[in-house]
Amino acid sequence: ADGFRDYFVQLTECEPARAAKFGMDHYTWLCINPKEAQDVAFARDVMKLIPEFIDRPNVLGIGEIGLNRNTSHEMTIFEEHLDLAVRLNQLVLIHTPHLEDKLKGTVMILSALKNRPDLDPCRVLVDHCEEHTFPLVKEAGYWAGLTLYPTSKLNPKRAADILELYGMDRVWANSAADW
């Protein structure tokens, strides 16, 4: 987990200093990514580091938490991240799977959130929504994130169609590089 301490220092000290040299502010979220949640003990060790960094001025909250392959280990760590966010009174950024079972993962995430009356939906963003998941997230009362990719996944045309159908209330738009 010490490698993550170095990573969190990079995100909260080095990157803001580097960005400032170019006149920019740098902000970050802190968590252990769902792809790394299969080793629950390791993930818990990393999560123990987060309180040390959470009050840094460039930290936005707990994220990008969620699911990757919709496994029980990922769900365990997701729920423990939610506990941490509530305990530390933090915003939450949630990752939905980039897989053919995105719908299943999104439903699992929304089901877990439904059981959390201690989480204010206005403080939760469910990201990487697509046509079949966007309305579910919006109907549940959470912020819906649209991640735009230049040539794959959710392109600008599809995102515009989603916004035309469902409106722009509680929508977060961001971009990512194609892999």
In which residue ranges do the predicted regions lie?
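Short acidic/histidine-rich active-site segments
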Residues: 169-179
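Short hydrophobic/aromatic-enriched beta-strand-loop microsegments
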Residues: 143-150
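Structural detector of well-ordered beta-strand residues that form the stable sheet scaffold
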Residues: 27-29, 93, 125, 145, ...
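Short, motif-level signal for alpha-helix interfacial/capping segments enriched in acidic residues
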Residues: 42-49, 151-166
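Histidine/acidic-residue-rich catalytic or RNA/ligand-binding cores of hydrolases
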Residues: 102-111, 134-140, 153-163, 177-179
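Short beta-strand/loop segments at the ligand-binding rim of alpha/beta enzyme cores
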Residues: 91, 119-123
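Short helix-capping segments at alpha-helix termini
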Residues: 20-22, 115-120, 166-167
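Mid-domain alpha/beta scaffold segments of enzyme catalytic cores
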Residues: 1-100, 104-112, 128-132, 139
